Amino acid sequence: MERNVILAKNAGFCFGVKRAVDEAIKYQKEFGKKIYTLGPLIHNNDVVNYLEDNNIFAIELSDADSLKKGDVVLIRSHGVKESVIKDLTDKGLIVKNATCPYVTNIQLKVKKCYEQGYKIIIVGDKNHPEVIGINGWCNDSAIITNGKTELENIPAKVCVVSQTTEKKETWNKVLNEIVRASKEIVAFNTICSATDVRQKSVQELSKEADLVFVIGGKNSSNTTKLYEICKKECPKSYHIENVKELDESLLEDESVKTIGITAGASTPDWIINEVISKIKEL
C-alpha cells in the first residue's frame, strides 16, 4: 500500500550532542587509550554501544576515585557542577569539557546572578543531569520546578532559567506565576533554539499524520517531550528506540495514509534511516 512518510525538520542529532560525540572520538584517537565519560555521553543506548566499541566508556562520578593520574575524563554535553571539574583536576585526571555551549551559557548566567544576590529558579527536571549540573553553579541552592505544581514562597528577587529541552508552554506557565509574586525578575528563556524549532515542527507534523514514530532513547528528556507533544495531536504516536521496536502490526491499518517520523537530539541519522527503510519495505 502506498504511504506518505514524512520526516520532521531538525530530527536527530543536535549541535551539542554531535559535538560531544565528535570530541570523544577525537580525544580517543589523540590519547590512544580509554576515554571515560561522566555518565552516558548521550541518552541513546545504540550510540553508547558504538562508543564502547571505540574504547569510550561511561562511568559514575563515584568511579572517578578508582581512576589513575593521567586518565582522561570527558564532561558530557549535559555539563556538571562547577566543583566537579575542580575535584577531577585535583585528582590529577586529564579533564576535557564537551558541555554543550548553550548549557555553559546557562551555568555562567546562574553563577553571575547568584553572586549578585538573586535566588535562582530552574524550570526543568530536578533529576536530569543538566539541571543537577546547573544547580551546582549556585551552590546547589536553586528552586527547581517542572511546572506541575504551583510554586510557593517565591522570593522577591529571582533569576529564572530553563533546562534546554523544556517545553515552551511549561516555561511560560512558570514565568507567569513568578511575575505575579516577585518584584525583581531576571528571566532567561534558555530553551535551546533547536529544541524550540524541533517541538514546533513535530506539533505541525503530528497534526497531518495518521501515525507518528518518535525515535530516541527511553531515558532521553527531549525525546520524551517530543512524544508528549505528538500524542496530544496524534493519538497513534509511539516512542521507539530503534527499528527493533517498530511494531509492524501498526502498519497493517489501511486507514494510515501518512506516517510521521521524528527523533530526539540523541538519535543519529543511521537509526532514523533504518526505521524509515523498514516502513517503506512493508
UniProtKB/Swiss-Prot annotation:
Q: Which reaction does it catalyse?
A: isopentenyl diphosphate + 2 oxidized [2Fe-2S]-[ferredoxin] + H2O = (2E)-4-hydroxy-3-methylbut-2-enyl diphosphate + 2 reduced [2Fe-2S]-[ferredoxin] + 2 H(+); dimethylallyl diphosphate + 2 oxidized [2Fe-2S]-[ferredoxin] + H2O = (2E)-4-hydroxy-3-methylbut-2-enyl diphosphate + 2 reduced [2Fe-2S]-[ferredoxin] + 2 H(+)
Which residues are involved in binding dimethylallyl diphosphate? Answer: H43, H78, H128, S220, S221, N222, S266
Positions contributing to (2E)-4-hydroxy-3-methylbut-2-enyl diphosphate binding: H43, H78, H128, T164, S220, S221, N222, S266
Keyword entries, A-Z: 4Fe-4S, Iron, Iron-sulfur, Isoprene biosynthesis, Metal-binding, Oxidoreductase
Provide the cofactor list for this protein: [4Fe-4S] cluster
A molecular-function term among this protein's GO annotations: metal ion binding
Record-listed [4Fe-4S] cluster binding positions? C14, C100, C192
Per the UniProt entry, the Enzyme Commission number(s) are 1.17.7.4
Question: Could you tell me which InterPro entries the record lists for this protein?
Answer: LytB/IspH (IPR003451)
Among the Pfam families in the record, one is LYTB
- Top-level EC class as recorded in UniProt: oxidoreductase
Residues recorded as binding isopentenyl diphosphate, renumbered to this chain, are H43, H78, H128, S220, S221, N222, S266
* Catalytic residues (positions): E130 (proton donor)
What family does this belong to?
Answer: Belongs to the IspH family.
Tell me, in a sentence or two, what this protein's role is: Catalyzes the conversion of 1-hydroxy-2-methyl-2-(E)-butenyl 4-diphosphate (HMBPP) into a mixture of isopentenyl diphosphate (IPP) and dimethylallyl diphosphate (DMAPP). Acts in the terminal step of the DOXP/MEP pathway for isoprenoid precursor biosynthesis.
Cite the HAMAP family for this sequence: IspH
Q: What is this protein called?
A: 4-hydroxy-3-methylbut-2-enyl diphosphate reductase
Q: Which organism is it from?
A: Clostridium perfringens (strain 13 / Type A)
